[in-house]
Every structure is written in structure tokens, then in C-alpha cells.
Amino acid sequence: MDAVAVSMAEGMQEPNMKPKRSLMLSGTFGFFQFIMPVLGFALVGTVFGFAKVLMKYVSAISTILLLYLSIKMFYSAYLKFRNKETEELQGNLMFQAIGTSVDALSLGFTFSHYSLGRVFLASFIIGIVTFFLCQIGIFIGKKFGTLFSGKADLLGGVILLLVIFLF
């Protein structure tokens, strides 16, 4: 849900998003949702103690990253309100993708009793579903972004805060 919420917020910020950018966003989120459970599975097999400790903090790490993204959106809305240019953060998409897929890493920890083939299949399905849900989120976000043109950053920040507190 958090990758979809971020996709929706991106769509609101950029209502005229080109299909290439939309595919890149959804593809990046889908890829990270695919690779993180595989990575979690690998960590359990090799570094079990570290994985157990990390699992305790997955929720906090994810919350902090999403809170940062929400604050960044509020700041961007403030700059637009003050008629100033917003700065584009390099690597922002990767930061968003990692922040929204940390929970998928912990899912990989629970795959320890599966075969590698089953882990890849389950992770592939998760990645594909994430890709399509993010496409839908971007589409909805673009519609709302057009509707709320000047307030898209503010609304995107509110949506991310809701994700943090509700999920």
C-alpha cells in the first residue's frame, strides 16, 4: 500500500506525467518489491542473527523513511506557495523505492522454509502486482493532481502521513 500511496502522490505532483516516467516509477517500485523478499530470504540463510534484529526495526525504519518523504512534500508545497522553485533530490526515486519496500524485506525472512524457486515465484508475483497497483495509483493521482492543481504536494504529504498512521 505504501508504494501505491507514493505513486499516487507522484501522480498528483506531476499530472502531465509521461508514460515513460510512469512506467519507470511503477517498474522501480515493482522491482524493489520483488527483490527485497529475495534478499530477506538470502539474509535468513546467511546472517540469521542480523535478520532477527533487523526484523524488530523494519516498521520503524519504514515509518521514518515515509515520514521524511511526507515532510519533503510539505516543504515542496510551502516553496510553491512562496513562489520559489523546488529543488529536485537526486536519487529520490531510489529512496522512495527502498523506503516503501523495507517491509517486503521482512517478508523474505518468513520464506526461510520455502525452496528458492517458490521464493522467486512469490516475489515475482508481489513485484508484478505492485507494478500494476502503482500504475493505477499514478493514474488516480494524476486525476486528483489536475483537480487540486496547486495543492498536489500538500495532499500527497497528507496521504503519506495517513499511510504511516493507518498501516
Which residues does each predicted region cover?
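Small-residue-enriched transmembrane helix starts and helix-helix packing motifs
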Residues: 1-3, 76-79, 85-99, 124
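Structural signature of hydrophobic alpha-helical transmembrane segments
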Residues: 1-4, 56-65, 119-132
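Selective transmembrane alpha-helices of multi-pass membrane proteins
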Residues: 33, 51-78, 148-167
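Cytoplasmic-side transmembrane-helix entry/capping segments in multi-pass membrane proteins
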Residues: 21-28, 86-94, 149-158
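Juxtamembrane transmembrane-helix termini in multi-pass membrane transport proteins
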Residues: 1-48, 112-117
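Alpha-helical transmembrane segments of multi-pass membrane proteins, especially transporters
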Residues: 21, 25-29, 33, 37, ...
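Hydrophobic alpha-helical transmembrane segments in multi-pass integral membrane proteins
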Residues: 34-42, 99-113, 161-167
